[in-house]
């Protein structure tokens, strides 16, 4: 039987976020990335969504390590939850390790976790795999791609990347090494598809710095800049522009403060002398000497910018003349919340700058021409598009074919799909592995399933009606009319007639149950009859379907 190498995406396909891929060869497994996704608008009460790792739990004795491409939440956010089920060593670059360590500390997992830092250009042996770290450019420092070497051949896993010829830290993507790998022979390329719909090249991060300088020089008031906390190169450019314009910078927002701490301690951010001040000291400075760097670029409720916009921030009150710069694009699904914050900022008299045309933000992902370069350099025999929704995966497939690849050598999979590669062929296995969504709600992981989510949706949309039935223990008779309690359905004091009708409907339903006046009346049967009758009545008369909960109390 021919030897097989398996590629098993557990997250990141047909979606944005939750990136996780398992590679299996010779009976051993390595895992690349372990990310989370933000909940959708209909996922009430959910903090985040993580991959289903039941396949990995079942095969944890065969796992040789977790390899992380970079420190964004969609690549590291699920690590604490997964580590509680699978104890495996983590390999990553130094800055990524600093961010992961913050998560491990929060979940008290530092002592039990083996966290190994690896420099770009170095390799790690993990069982039958040798994983080579290759520097790439992205919107976070210390990002890498992996060349995963096996006896069957080499897989290039790009992670998130772009080609930036003028990066802020001076470290360009290692195209030379990718070209060498192409000459040596690449069995399979697994590449980022996020920006495949965009033609051309992604602009350099450096252009944003020039925009900051123009904005700062043309403003005589306070400036507030919001961006992704993880984009230390973006924050570095804010600091540099402020220093050149003679302004002081204060930072607010927990994730921004944490990121500043890690990046400065590890040397990935250099704060100009006498530029950074505590936010409580800003009030003593003229407004034209102030810059605030804050979280909240996605309109997140309770983020620092959100609290400023809605006047609940303890230190900062937005006023007329303030210039607010949104140096980030709205993640798909966040447009409404971002718009709400922008509207409130305008309402307070602030000038809000957020147009993409002003080059206030550039993507961290490769556009079409950059992807073509990677395909041309690596010359893969097989190709698997990763990281994207279905249309992105399909368009990336088309791009690969334009580069000369045979369609039979390209696999578009779903999460849980098993891609099998021999030396000469690639196919999607008829068998898949579990790869659904696991919901994180507070300290609960996976204890909220489809039924609970359906109940939450119903409660959110139509509310709840509780019918309390006081029953005599002796003879099973109703002692008094049922008490009707509603939440999120309608205001009881203004719905007296409806409440009386509900009481009558509930009493009639209770009396209709077999043995209605007998001591042995079955509580379950009683609850069922009342629930059915009340639900039907409410829908008929209000066209709403609240959750109806009958409660039997025996006295």
Would you name each region that the model predicts?
Residues 2-67, 72-284, 303-317, 336-340:
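His/Asp/Glu-rich metal-coordinating catalytic cores
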Residues 104, 400, 538:
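Conserved hydrophobic residues forming the short capping helix/wall of the S-adenosyl-L-methionine
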Residues 197-327, 331-356, 360-501, 505-520, ...:
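Hard-cation-handling environments
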Residues 119, 414, 544-548:
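Short Gly/Ser/Thr- and Asp/Glu-enriched loop/turn motifs at secondary-structure junctions
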């Amino acid at each position: 039987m021919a030897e097989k190498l398996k590629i098993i995406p557990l997250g990141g396909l047909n979606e944005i976020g939750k990136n996780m891929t398992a590679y299996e060869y010779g009976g051993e497994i390595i895992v690349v990335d372990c990310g989370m996704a933000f909940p959708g608008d209909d996922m009430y009460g959910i903090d985040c969504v993580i991959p289903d790792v039941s396949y990995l739990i079942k095969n944890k004795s065969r796992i040789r390590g977790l390899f992380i491409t970079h420190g964004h939440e969609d690549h590291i956010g699920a690590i604490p939850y997964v580590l509680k089920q699978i104890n495996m060593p983590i390999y990553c670059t130094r800055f990524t390790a600093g961010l992961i360590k913050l998560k491990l500390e929060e979940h008290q997992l530092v002592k039990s976790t083996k966290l190994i830092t690896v420099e770009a250009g170095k390799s790690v042996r993990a069982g039958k795999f040798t994983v080579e770290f290759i520097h790439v450019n992205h919107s976070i420092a210390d990002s890498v791609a992996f060349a995963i070497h096996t006896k069957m051949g080499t897989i290039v896993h790009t992670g998130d990347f772009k080609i930036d010829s003028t990066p802020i830290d001076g470290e360009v993507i290692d195209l030379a090494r990718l070209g060498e790998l192409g000459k040596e022979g690449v069995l399979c390329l697994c590449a980022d598809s996020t920006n495949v719909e965009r033609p051309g090249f992604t602009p350099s991060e450096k252009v944003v710095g020039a925009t900051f300088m123009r904005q700062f020089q043309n403003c005589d008031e306070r400036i507030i800049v919001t961006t992704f906390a993880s984009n230390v190169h973006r924050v570095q450019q804010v600091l540099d522009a402020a220093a050149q314009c003679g302004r002081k910078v204060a930072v607010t927002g927990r994730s921004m403060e944490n990121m500043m701490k890690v990046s400065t301690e590890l040397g990935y951010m250099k704060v100009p002398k006498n530029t950074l001040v505590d936010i409580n000291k800003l009030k003593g400075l003229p407004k034209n000497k102030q810059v605030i760097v804050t979280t909240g670029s996605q309109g997140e409720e309770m983020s620092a910018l959100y609290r400023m916009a809605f006047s609940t921030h303890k230190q900062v009150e937005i006023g007329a003349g303030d210039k607010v710069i949104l140096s980030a694009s709205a993640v798909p699904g966040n447009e409404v919340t971002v718009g709400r914050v922008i509207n409130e900022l305008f309402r307070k008299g602030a000038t809000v700058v957020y147009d993409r045309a002003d080059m206030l933000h550039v993507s961290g992902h490769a556009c079409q021409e950059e992807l073509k370069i990677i395909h041309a350099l690596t010359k893969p025999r097989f190709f698997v598009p990763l990281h994207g929704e279905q249309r992105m995966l399909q368009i990336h497939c088309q791009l690969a074919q334009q580069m000369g690849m045979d369609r039979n050598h390209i696999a578009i999979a779903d999460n849980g799909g098993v891609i099998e590669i021999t030396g000469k062929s690639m196919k999607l296995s008829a068998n898949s592995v579990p790869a659904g969504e696991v919901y994180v709600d507070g300290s609960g992981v996976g204890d909220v399933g489809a039924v609970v989510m359906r109940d939450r949706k119903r409660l959110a949309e139509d509310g709840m009606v509780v019918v309390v039935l006081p029953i005599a223990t002796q003879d099973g008779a109703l002692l008094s009319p049922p008490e009707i309690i509603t939440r999120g359905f309608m205001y009881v004091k203004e719905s007296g007639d409806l409440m009386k009708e509900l009481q009558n409907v509930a009493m009639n339903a209770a009396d209709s149950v077999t043995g209605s006046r007998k001591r042995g009346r079955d509580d379950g049967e009683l609850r069922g009859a009342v629930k059915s009758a009340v639900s039907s009545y409410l829908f008929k008369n209000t066209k709403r379907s609240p959750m109806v909960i009958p409660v039997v109390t025996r006295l």
